[in-house]
Amino acid sequence: MKITISGTGYVGLSNGLLIAQHHDVVALDIVPSRVELLNDRISPIVDKEIQQFLKEDNIRFRATLDKFDAYQNADYVIIATPTDYDPKTNYFNTSSVESVMQDVISINPAAVMIIKSTVPVGFTAAMRQKFATENIIFSPEFLREGKALYDNLYPSRIVIGEQSERAREFAALLQEGAIKQEIPTLFTDSTEAEAIKLFANTYLAMRVAYFNELDSYAETLGLNTRQIIEGVCLDPRIGNHYNNPSFGYGGYCLPKDTKQLLANYQSVPNNIISAIVEANRTRKDFIADAILARKPKVVGIYRLIMKSGSDNFRASSIQGIMKRIKAKGVEVIIYEPVMEEDTFFNSRLERDLHCFKQQADVIISNRMAAELLDVAEKVYTRDLFGSD
């Protein structure tokens, strides 16, 4: 079977390499340097399992810039292109997904398109009508950046937004590549599958916001946050997981998915979802005020990335803190080794960690790192448990 992947980010590569253990996979991208890296079996992103799989001889995987080469004779085309949230329209920008669909229908109308990109509720049904085809299925992705392939090898669940034989066939491709056995698999209608993805991420954002608000309360009243969280999480209905305070939820998925869900249901009475978005803003204000209370002349930002093991700093929570501090006229310097630029939002990047530590009066780090232990007295973090 020939499977094509459109988009070579975390979602595309993790799905492609999972399936390439047993089938021929072609990855399509528009960036020549990225395609060249992949054909040299070098990962363009930081992900241990992706890096390992690319080195394996039995992985039937190649990359191309040629959409005709990619789409011709493909049985399935997995669409994993970016759908950034557009604050002007309160909507995901789905233009890249729609462009892929147009190309696939022109080149290989028999191919079944599987949307892995996150899309608004109702998008798949609208695209079937727009392009006059039933060959579009939505299947949400549940993965962590930096552990994308791992999360496909050991998936928590598989959701396919169609109840059909071809949906079961695609689910079998994912199950075949996974190491985990007995994977919970759910077949739903397309719109319900889209809602599952957005509501799942919104719940995670709510949990982050909840423990952050608990931490803000404890900090304000001089209480021990760790003791409170440990006591609260002994209740098995709450559970001792995903409870480490932070600078707010961030990254590529949670901020845009909560806002999209809010926009999707603006005509439906709701309180919780809007409160989650507002709570995240309030948390960033609280953190910035706590840092400014130390009256630093220079604040050092240790890493822009959202979490350890990732090379992605899109919409990371620490950026919101940085912007609030800069707005008060405080100088900000940044240590971020994965960035090639010399500045970020008009703040200087310091590439030497020792010099960075010397120059900063306060170093802010969303998660504590071993290489900051020698200047622990300078570090401001709300990391209590050493986990994401």
UniProtKB/Swiss-Prot annotation:
Pathway: Nucleotide-sugar biosynthesis; UDP-alpha-D-glucuronate biosynthesis; UDP-alpha-D-glucuronate from UDP-alpha-D-glucose: step 1/1; Bacterial outer membrane biogenesis; lipopolysaccharide biosynthesis
Superkingdom of the organism of origin: Bacteria
Active site (catalytic residues): C253
Pfam families noted in UniProt: UDPG_MGDP_dh, UDPG_MGDP_dh_C, UDPG_MGDP_dh_N
GO biological process: lipopolysaccharide biosynthetic process; UDP-glucuronate biosynthetic process
Keyword flag Transmembrane helix: no
Catalytic activity: UDP-alpha-D-glucose + 2 NAD(+) + H2O = UDP-alpha-D-glucuronate + 2 NADH + 3 H(+)
Residues that hold substrate according to the record: E141, F142, L143, R144, E145, K197, N201, Y242, N243, N244, P245, S246, G250, K307
Binding-site positions, NAD(+): 2-19, 29, 83, 118, 145, 252, 256, 314
Keywords: NAD, Oxidoreductase
GO molecular function, one term: NAD binding
Enzyme Commission number(s) of this protein: 1.1.1.22
Family to which the UniProt record says this protein belongs: Belongs to the UDP-glucose/GDP-mannose dehydrogenase family.
Protein name from the UniProt record: UDP-glucose 6-dehydrogenase
Biological classification of the source: Bacteria, Pseudomonadati, Pseudomonadota, Gammaproteobacteria, Enterobacterales
